Amino acid sequence: MKWINKNRENQPASLKRHLTTPHHNYDNYKEKDELRDALLKEQGFICCYCMQRIQEANKNKMEIEHFRPQSIYDGTNGKPDLTLDYTNLLASCKGNEGSLKHLQHCDEHKGNDEVEINPMNKDLMGKIRFNAAGRIFVSETNELDKRLNHDLNHTLNLNIQTLVTERKKIWQTLEQRMRKEFGTKNPSKSFINQKIKEWSAQDEGKFKTMCQVAIYYLEKKLKKAV
């Protein structure tokens, strides 16, 4: 996961128009591909949870994720209606849709459950850690951290083996590059900063898959750089 700089100004014109029509709701909003496109561009074409690349803004390639679930935040039972609130909408991958439950992840595995690990919260995203084994986690110091790890491991299923393997590969590739460039010596700050810049940048509006894994690794190395 990485921080998503959510901006209501990025919502598409079709959604703004729809919100002014009588009896508007999520189901009768017919221009969802325009919404998908806006969400993907805002996120640099990666999933809001696992950070895998989402290639196209259509319903066969991605889900419109309601961070606060539609089934709860629909304007009933004293809850606000967030079903068309742009600040509640994210782009999620398909998460192995159609597979057995234990093989699903992201929005597909989350379903109607609520999570606290909010990719739009910069402070919470600052708690995210990765390790050489490819796992994503939060260092536990309090009850909130335990709940965040439950979200990562169970509700979102982000430590499913396929995702762990992909993150581990990125980590190992960077380690190999470091050894090739510097051997047993500490890397230079200029080299590390250049790599951070590369992994933080968007190529034609698109982040690299799981870019935050690389950025986390490189920022750790930067502390030891010379």
Identify the residue ranges that each predicted region occupies.
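Long, low-complexity, intrinsically disordered segments enriched in glycines and aromatic residues
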Residues: L100-N159, L163
